[in-house]
Amino acid sequence: GGAEKAAAMQSIMLTKLGYQVHIVLISNIIVFNYKGIIYNLGELKDKNNTFIGKIKRTFLFRKYLKDNKFDAIIDNRLRSNGLLNEIGICKYVYRNFKVLYVVHSASYKEEILKSTYLKKWLLSKAFKIITVSEGLRVFLKQFYNNNTLVCIENAVEVEAINYVTNQPFEIPYKYILFCGRFDEKCKNIKLLINAYSNSKIYNTGVKLLLLGEGDDREMYEELVANLNIAKYVEFKPFTINPYVYMKHAIATVLTSFYEGFPLVLVESLACGTPVIAINCETGPSEIIVNNVNGLLLETYNEDELSFALQKITNEKDTLNKFKANAVESIQKFNFTSISEKWKNILENH
């Protein structure tokens, strides 16, 4: 997911800045390129995930931190586990360490509103709370000390993306792209499918390509069948290189109910491909300049999204303008700029 990808990118940035990086894996899964020394608690989790197993891993985690005498800990976990687990990590494992907690998702807003005091207490000793968008930072000001909150967006490595997009690619049709998790509660993909059907851009040979995996795929396939657009909608599985799909798309679309920092939009723009997104509370408005590098919609309105799909498909001058502005528009999120933000926080505070 996005948090794992961001953590992997952090490991590469910090290694290039000269820091010795260790990565503690909570789950035994490595998908993205990284730099650093791996300590894999996930292997132990696979062998024994009982209550006793969890207690043992908590003690081992604490011992690993103490043995290595780390100067700083960057916690990229989503922190959606049970209360006992969070108390064990925040109040025991991290005790007397300099900890930077990264808040990746706006879903944290709902969680914190459910248990305001608890969230404040768990992170009360935080050295910094890093938010991946300015909107998230502003929201969290009501719960945490403003001096503790810092916005550091997720980075994108444009040169590396350009390199991998040069791979052979053999999709013979034009398409609108969705790239992400098939999770309706967050991603709101039914709206995109309905708007695509309503737009009738398939009559001009433009398909809808849904790239990803998740529990809701079957529901989307059923919706596509019911709308009689199955021959115009393609489902493709998760790939480590979604960028080649982004490069050849007409546009990448995001209809999420919430995001922290929708990296997929930045990655698409890095590929030179415009974006269409609904302006959920945090994220899209910090990336998209409406009618400059894409279209930023203000409501979850099917007709409005259908019109946006028609506009970007049919108006070649508009599409070419967005393409021309795409890469330049995301320079503030480049590898060097975001690396400097991390260096500043780690060394000057």
Pin down the residues of each PLM region.
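A conserved mid-protein helix/loop that constitutes part of the nucleotide-sugar donor-binding site
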Residues: E4-M9, D183-N198, L208, D215-E221, ...
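Conserved donor-binding/catalytic core segment of Leloir-type glycosyltransferases
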Residues: P168-K187, I193-Y196, K323
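Active-site donor-binding acidic/aromatic loop of nucleotide-activated sugar
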Residues: D216-M219, A230-T239, Y245, L295-L296
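Aromatic "clamp/platform" in nucleotide-sugar-dependent glycosyltransferases that forms part
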Residues: F257
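Short hydrophobic beta-strand element within catalytic cores of glycosyltransferases
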Residues: P274-I278
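Conserved acidic donor-binding segment of nucleotide-sugar-dependent glycosyltransferases
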Residues: N279, V289-N291, L295-E302, K311-K316, ...
